[in-house]
Amino acid sequence: MGKIIGIDLGTTNSCVAVLDGGKARVLENAEGDRTTPSIVAYTDEEIIVGQPAKRQAVTNPNNTFFAIKRLIGRRFKDDEVQRDVDIMPFKIIGADNGDAWVEQRGNKMAPPQVSAEILKKMKKTAEDFLGEEVTEAVITVPAYFNDSQRQATKDAGRIAGLEVKRIINEPTAAALAYGIDKKQGDNIVAVYDLGGGTFDISIIEIDSNDGDQTFEVLATNGDTHLGGEDFDNRLINYLADEFKKDQGLDLRRDPLAMQRLKEAAEKAKIELSSTNQTEVNLPYITADASGPKHLVVKVTRTKLESLVEDLIQRTLEPLKVALADADLSVSEINEVILVGGQTRMPKVQEAVTNFFGKEPRKDVNPDEAVAVGAAIQAGVLSGEVKDVLLLDVTPLSLGIETMGSVMTKLIDKNTTIPTKAQQVFSTADDNQSAVTIHVLQGERKQASANKSLGQFNLEGIEPAPRGQPQVEVMFDIDADGILHVSATDKKTGKKQNITIKASSGLSDEEVEQMVRDAEAHADEDAKFEALVQARNQADGLVHATKKQVTEAGDALASDEKEKIEAAMAAVDEATKGKDAEAIEKATQALIEASAKLMEIAQAKSQAQGGEEAQAKDAGQSNDDVVDAEFEEVKDDKK
C-alpha cells in the first residue's frame, strides 16, 4: 500500500509531510523550500504554482490567485467575500449557483479548481521524495469550517487526483504534532491558530498513559474570515490612503499597483515583527499626465498595531466562548500553542499571554506543525502509528427548519465525531403528502440566520390529519465532519437519504469534469516540459557548436562551415516555435551537419596525445630519482 501524505492546505502557505522511519518529515519542494506560497498563476502557456507564481504576480495580477481558501465553499453575496472583491487584484465573480468564483482570461473557475493546483504541487513534492505515485492524503481545514467548506476541500483533493482519506482540523493536527512525544500525564492544551485567512481556537485534552495516547477536543471556536490577509489589507488600505492624500490618485483602481502594494505591505508587516520602523518605498507605482509617481511611506510598529488592534481583539471573544463550552477556567489550561504565521507578530503574542496568564510555547513551528499533525493522522489511518486515538468535534450545531421558521437542533456544537442523532417530526397540515427537510448549521434560533446546507423532499406520505404522520430524521456525521441525512416515514417505511451538498457547491458531474480538465492540463504540462527540455538541449548544442567552429579555424572547409551555420539557423528558428518534435529534428540535423567538426576535434585530440607521450618519454629518466627526506634529530644526551 502506498503512503498516505499529510497536507496543510493554507491560505498563505501550504506544506506537505510524510512519515519517514516512524517520524513525521516535512518535505522540501522543487524550489528547496519547506513551505509553498498558496499562489496559482495562469499564463498563455502554463499553470505556475508557489514561489514562481509569486515572482511573476506583479506582471500578471489579473490571473494570479492568492488567498483562494477565503472563497472556498462561500457564496458570492457573503459579507466576507464582498469585503475582498474591491481589494483583490483579480476578479471575484458570482457563479450560476451563487458561489464565489474567480475569473482568469475570460474563464470562470471554482475555488476548488484553483486549490487543486496547490494540492497537485504538494502531491508531486511527496512523489519526488518517495519515488512512487501518491494517491491518498489527509488534508487539514480550519476547525471552524462549515460543511460546505469541508466538502469543497474534498472536491479540490479529487480534482488533484487524491483520495482524501480524512479531513482533520488544523488545531487538532497541531496538538498531535506537539503531543505525540509526550509520553506520560494529562495535559489540557489551548491551540491558538491565526493563519493567513482563518482563526481557530481549540481546547484539547492530551492523555498519555502507558504508551496509549488520546487527543480529545473539548471545544472549538473561531472565525473563518480572519487572518494575516486581513492584517495585510489594513496596511494596504492605509498605504493607499496616504498616497491618495499626497498625490490625489487612488491606487485601488490599478491592479498592477495593488499587487506591488500587497507585496510591500506583507514585507513591511513581517519586518515590523523584529524592528520598530520600516519604510515602504515603491518608485514608479503609477503615473498621471504630470509624470510618474512614487510611494514613500514610513510605518512604525505602533502604527501597524493601531491599524490591527480590533482584529487582535476579535480573536479573544472565541477564546472565552471555547473555554465556557469546555467548562474550564483560564487557570486550568496547562499549555498554550501558537500556530499560523500571523502569531509571530509581537502584539498577538502579547494579547495571548495576557489572556491566558502564561507564555505560549516556543518549541512548536507555527508554519509546519499542522502538516506534521496531518502526517501523523495519516500514519494512524495506515497503521504505521499505533496507540493514538483522536476524538474531534463538530464546530457548529446541526438541525432542521421546523414550523415557524425555527431551527431545531439535532446535534449540538462540540459533539465528538463521528456521531448520530435522530428525532421524530410530523406534518404541519392535514393530508400533507410530502415534507421538505431543510438542513441548517449554526447557533441561531431563527432558521434564516443560520447556514443552509441543503434541502430534500420525502414524498408519498399517506393522507392523515396534521400531527399524526411520523417522520424520523437521522443525522450522521462522519469522521471528516461531513453530514449525511436521512428521513423515513415510520408508517410506510419510505426513506430518502442524502450526503448533504451545499445549496450551492459543485455537483459530482462538475467535479468529474474538473478532474478530466486537470488530467488534460497534466498532458499539456508534460508537453510544455518536453518543449522546454528540447529548447534547452537545442540552445546548448548551438552554443557548443559555435565554440567548436571557432576552435576549428581554417581546418574547417568553407562549404562545411556554411552547412553547419545553416543548420544552426534552422535550430534557432525551430526554438521560436512550440513544436518540440520540430526542434528535436532540427537538433538532430545539426548533429549530422557537424560530423566534420567531430573529426577535426578528434584529430586535434590525437595529435595532442602524441605530443604528451613524447614529453613523458623524455622525462622518463628522471622518474628513477628519489628525493631524500631528512629529519633533524637532536641529541639530548649530554
Swiss-Prot record:
SUPFAM superfamilies membership: Actin-like ATPase domain (SSF53067), Heat shock protein 70kD (HSP70), peptide-binding domain (SSF100920)
Conditions for induction: By stress conditions e.g. heat shock.
Record region (Disordered): 602-638
Phosphothreonine modification, residue list: T198
Compositionally biased residues, Acidic residues: 624-638
Pfam families for this protein: HSP70
Keyword list, A-Z: ATP-binding, Chaperone, Nucleotide-binding, Phosphoprotein, Stress response
InterPro entries: ATPase_NBD, Chaperone_DnaK, Heat_shock_70_CS, HSP70_C_sf, HSP70_peptide-bd_sf, Hsp_70_fam
GO MF annotation: an example: ATP binding
Regions crossing the membrane: none
Family designation: Belongs to the heat shock protein 70 family.
Purpose of the protein: Acts as a chaperone.
Name of the molecule in the record: Chaperone protein DnaK
Protein's organism: Shewanella denitrificans (strain OS217 / ATCC BAA-1090 / DSM 15013)
Gene: dnaK
